[in-house]
Amino acid sequence: MINIDDYKLGVEFAAEYKYGNIIPNGGLPYAAILMGVMFKHCRGMARIYCHGFKPELVCELPFWTEFCAYIRNPKNCLYALVDSTEWINERPMKLLKQLKEERSITEHVIEYKRRKEGKGNKKVKKEKDIIIPDTSIIVKQIHPDSAKMIAKRYGESIHFSVFDNEKFRYEYDSENYKAYGSFNQPDNCRYLIETFDQAFNDPASKIII
């Protein structure tokens, strides 16, 4: 692997000029660079399938800086599938939960229902608060059947992220953060998006944030 500073310059250059070449990506610090630059250049839609927003990666710079900047903008969307809830109380997931709660809307609803009373009906007033959840951030735990579907298509131990419709990072060895990516491959992104959306829209996938 090349010098980390040279690698960062190369990744920034590829992002700026939207090069479609494949970028090798392996090891935690290199993964943090590529993910950080992808968040930096994302225009508003990020799809993430990961183990569970592991803080050892997400909190590594520049990943953490760009991740925070992206999700703090309410115009940006982040949809995520996670295998595990092991890190739900760590910084990345706590921040996602906090932002979602802040953006959710509470509406006070008044309902009138008729209740049978004696020979007639009585009008009864009921008041309640309804929380309308924010939809710019949604994190689901993937259902095992959907995880098997992805493994059947792409192999075991893979995760991937797609930014907008043309940028992606495909991780084929999650334990060692070995991956590759590109800033301009819409055809490959289309297949990954179709796979992600199929799993994400599975009613059995549980919303956790």
PLM region spans:
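PLD/PLD-like phosphodiesterase catalytic module centered on the HKD motif
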Residues: 1-47, 51-209
